[in-house]
């Protein structure tokens, strides 16, 4: 009887260990007054999609991390979005650079209006680098899901095409910047934006899954 009880306990421990998340995602909290907290349902939905379709093991709930925090190193992938001003202190610049050059990955999603604020701040992080547009044949567009034309357009604002830019440090893509796309909006709960279709939302989630798969395998 004692032996059976011991075996049962071991089995329960093994089963519970399978539910321990391997990874976590975080949204970046920054200073400057911009709405860093936007797209509230985006990451939880992306996490669920990746766990279901890529068989990843992300913690279901996303977390929040400040740019200058040591906690940033707990996440293989961090997400920054917003419409307005962004300011990185010198300590935050150093911390973010250390994170990115040490294996971390930053996805910046322009929620329309972020561009003029985020570019100068990222220039402080990598003064020696320029954002380069990733061509449609870049591997990030051809992971589990194929996007032969590159970054998909999710929301229309002013007729410009969607563009995916990258910062490449010593041959490794460390930051992916989605511009004129609103990818994160597409990850949000269906119905958040009345004009969105299920098709456009699925397209956004598939592109997000490609991004996560690329980050975890590059």
Regions of interest found by a model, annotated:
Residues 1-7:
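Positively charged n-region of N-terminal signal peptides that target proteins for export
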Residues 7-16:
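Bacterial N-terminal signal peptides
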Residues 21-23, 73-77, 101-105, 129, ...:
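Loop/turn elements at helix/coil->beta-strand transitions in domains of secreted/extracellular proteins
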Residues 25, 77-116:
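Short alpha-beta junction capping motif
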Residues 57-65, 108-111, 129-137:
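Surface-exposed patches in mature extracellular/periplasmic domains of secreted proteins
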Residues 60-67, 89-95, 159-163:
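Alpha-helical scaffolding within the catalytic cores
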């Amino acid at each position: 009887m004692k032996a059976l009880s011991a075996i049962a306990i071991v089995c329960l421990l093994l089963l519970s260990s399978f539910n321990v998340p391997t990874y976590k995602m975080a949204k970046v909290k920054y200073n400057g007054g911009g709405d860093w907290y936007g797209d509230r349902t985006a990451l939880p939905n992306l996490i669920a999609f990746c766990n279901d379709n890529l068989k990843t093991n992300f913690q279901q709930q996303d977390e929040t991390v400040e740019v200058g925090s040591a906690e940033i190193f707990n996440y293989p992938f961090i997400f920054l979005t917003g419409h307005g001003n962004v300011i990185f202190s010198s300590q935050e610049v150093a911390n973010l650079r250390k994170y990115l050059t040490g294996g971390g990955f930053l996805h910046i999603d322009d929620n329309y209006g972020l561009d003029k604020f985020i570019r100068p701040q990222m220039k402080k992080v990598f003064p020696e680098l320029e954002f380069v547009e990733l061509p449609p044949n870049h591997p990030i567009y051809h992971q589990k899901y194929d996007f032969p034309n590159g970054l998909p357009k999710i929301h229309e604002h002013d007729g410009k095409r969607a563009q995916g830019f990258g910062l490449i440090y010593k041959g490794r893509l460390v930051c992916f910047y989605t511009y004129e796309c609103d990818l994160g909006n597409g990850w949000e709960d269906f119905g958040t934006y009345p004009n969105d279709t299920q098709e456009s939302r699925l397209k956004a989630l598939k592109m997000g899954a490609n991004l996560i798969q690329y980050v975890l395998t590059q």
